[in-house]
Amino acid sequence: MSRSMALSQLLPDVALTHDVQVSGLVMDSRAVRPGDAFVAIAGFGAHGLGFVEQARANGAAAVLFEPPAPDGLPVPADAIAVPGLRARLGVMADQFHGRPSQAMRMVGVTGTNGKTSTVQLLAQALTLLGTPTGTLGTLGVGLYGAAVPTGFTTPLVLPTHALLAQLRDDGAQAVAMEVSSHALDQGRVDAVHFDVAVFTNLTRDHLDYHGDMAQYGAAKAKLFARAGLKAAVVNLDDAFGHTLFAALDPALRAIGVSSRAHADASVSAQALQLDHNGINFALNIRGQVHPVHSPLLGRFNVDNLLAVAGALWAMEFAPAQIASVLGQLQPIHGRMNRLGGAHGAPLVVVDYAHTPDALEQALSSLRSHAQDRLICVFGCGGERDTGKRPQMAAIAELKADVAIVTDDNPRGEDGDAIVADILRGFARPDAAIVQRDRAAAIHQAIGMASPSDIVLIAGKGHEPYQEVAGVRHAFDDALVAAQALLPRTVLGVRP
């Protein structure tokens, strides 16, 4: 739906020499369309004032900037100086798009691991319960099942409001949204109205950005102190979650979830059993107990299901409805996806686990399903937290029977250097298999596996590419694994 608004409505406190109708608010000069207002602020490596000519050539109707302008960058005579521009972008975008987040039931999910799975499972559940639901996160934006990639876990603030408006216009009545620590720290969700906030867990990640765990946790906690929030769903089995829960505003509806019998939990999983068919437990919501039989794989998916249950209860669904829909939820692409496991082929699991905690959870969960060996293929991304590389090696050595180290997304970093960092975490590095070619590593793992083994391919999950030296090459772990499994499935023997 096309929109336009007078600039004076968006900037009532700014003296304008002339008023214009603008058809959008855009920070990327390449994305400017005729009639847009170009927002020229400091970016990650450059300032928007350096791209005014390109924005003008693309039809920008106005140029906004935050004074003072950097030295050496000319300011067009008709550019509009807006004090505190960056801080008010969320409010401006919210107003321009007609306050889309207030027109839908908004659930924000934050945490180190489980954000994507929780968002996708919640959207799937709400859709099954008759509520058209949009998703916004790692897998993209769109109504459930029709997401289009954005390239961000949480987009920048102007696109975030535009995408929410798109979901509203497409008929979404609810939105499940991943809210990263970067987004909370950088104001990407400024002026987004959330009804329910969900916390999954806090483990080591992004310390290259936040510096330490205290600052990382403080960034996550910002979601739970937002004006207008009605309910908070918190994993009480996580140490930081327990602290966060105790500090919640008493005016909030606080819903603690636990699969480990935490006394303060109002939503819990009891009598938990994992088998080759999935997960079985009794869902207890404030004393109302209903059985859940889920086809999902892995102990941590119990936590994801409880997060979904807590969010649904916060949205006033009945416990019986919640238990029923949990059992209908199907796996998310790239999150503990199952391949093989029949006709002489080993069970192969593709998962996005790319942090120490996520890898440990994936391996520990699969150990409870394994009849024989657990083979792990993993690597670490380039230009990211180097401290987690030896940690992931130690976990793979401890939790798997065979560890194969390979390339993840080296990006602009030397792959041999990444592998060297990883190998430092092995007590016996000579026992690790190094095969930097990821496709070859996957074929090697599946080729050595017996029918009773489990192969975990960790790190990339849903990603359809591998980034090497700044170039994204087509690559899909699940597709490569399926190709490697084909001779096993057809012949029923090892190739």
From Swiss-Prot:
The keyword Magnesium is annotated on this UniProt entry: yes
UniProt xrefs under SUPFAM superfamilies: MurD-like peptide ligases, catalytic domain, MurD-like peptide ligases, peptide-binding domain, MurE/MurF N-terminal domain
Principal subcellular localization: cytoplasm
Post-translational modification N6-carboxylysine, affected residues: 220
Keyword set, alphabetical order: ATP-binding, Cell cycle, Cell division, Cell shape, Cell wall biogenesis/degradation, Cytoplasm, Ligase, Magnesium, Nucleotide-binding, Peptidoglycan synthesis
Enzyme Commission (EC) number: 6.3.2.13
Subcellular location: Cytoplasm
Keyword set includes Metal-binding: no
Pathway the protein acts in: Cell wall biogenesis; peptidoglycan biosynthesis
Swiss-Prot/TrEMBL catalytic activity: UDP-N-acetyl-alpha-D-muramoyl-L-alanyl-D-glutamate + meso-2,6-diaminopimelate + ATP = UDP-N-acetyl-alpha-D-muramoyl-L-alanyl-gamma-D-glutamyl-meso-2,6-diaminopimelate + ADP + phosphate + H(+)
Binding sites annotated in the UniProt record for ATP: 111-117
GO MF annotation list: ATP binding; magnesium ion binding; UDP-N-acetylmuramoylalanyl-D-glutamate-2,6-diaminopimelate ligase activity
Listed cofactors: Mg(2+)
GO terms for cellular component: cytoplasm
Modification(s) after translation: Carboxylation is probably crucial for Mg(2+) binding and, consequently, for the gamma-phosphate positioning of ATP.
GO BP field: cell division; cell wall organization; peptidoglycan biosynthetic process; regulation of cell shape
Role description: Catalyzes the addition of meso-diaminopimelic acid to the nucleotide precursor UDP-N-acetylmuramoyl-L-alanyl-D-glutamate (UMAG) in the biosynthesis of bacterial cell-wall peptidoglycan.
Family: Belongs to the MurCDEF family. MurE subfamily.
Protein name per the record: UDP-N-acetylmuramoyl-L-alanyl-D-glutamate--2,6-diaminopimelate ligase
Organism: Xanthomonas axonopodis pv. citri (strain 306)
Higher taxonomy: Bacteria, Pseudomonadati, Pseudomonadota, Gammaproteobacteria, Lysobacterales
